[in-house]
Amino acid sequence: IIIGSGIAGLYASLLARERGSVLVLTKASIDECNTRFAQGGIAAPVGRGDSPQLHFQDTIQAGAGLSDPEAVRVLVEEAADRINDLIRFGVPFDTQEGEVALALEAAHSVPRILHAGGDATGEHIETTLSRQARSNGVAIKEHSLVPRLLVERGRARGVRAVDLASGREEEYQGRFIIRKAIPTVDSWEVPVIQSPLSN
């Protein structure tokens, strides 16, 4: 069970679907998420002359001491593989002369910003991932708010959801519960079990 249908939730649903059945619960329609409104591009060290180490240095310097070095390290080391996943899922990144186009922006020392549809990157990623999720058999339940986990012996075993159209409560069971970006996270008393599929 995946809670949320933004880029993180849809991406996780496609990876998890490679290993079993998946249900995505989202409080609005699948195309009503913040991902759709994300403009600009995605930074990843995928170009010639670039590296995770250089990307790390640029990011730490631009962060002016506010960046968590371990989080930045994970981000830059994983970025190229995640971009390759998005390409595999069909995200139409802009190209130039047959290769992914890379722009030089902000505090980056080399071109490493990928765009899709110019500044409509978020919309293109969300549209592509939601289409792939549906065509790959990911079950999607829209207008379903998840206020509570179902816990058994200290482990999350499912969720209680409210169908926002009917007001009816529904329960869903699952071996793994993945939550990514939901506003009520801090109100949950029991931690969610993170699936190894999300790594």
Positions of the model-derived regions?
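N-terminal Rossmann-like FAD-binding beta1-loop-alpha1 element of flavoenzymes
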Residues: 1-24
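Short glycine/serine/threonine-rich phosphate/pyrophosphate-binding segments
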Residues: 9-12, 170, 186-187
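Generic hydrophobic/aromatic pocket-lining and core-packing "Φ" positions
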Residues: 12-13, 83, 190
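Short, glycine/charged-enriched secondary-structure capping and boundary segments
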Residues: 16, 37-40, 187, 191-194
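Conserved N-terminal/central alpha/beta ligand/cofactor-binding core
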Residues: 21, 26-157, 161-163
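Glycine-rich loop(s) and the adjacent beta-strand/alpha-helix scaffold that form part
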Residues: 175-199
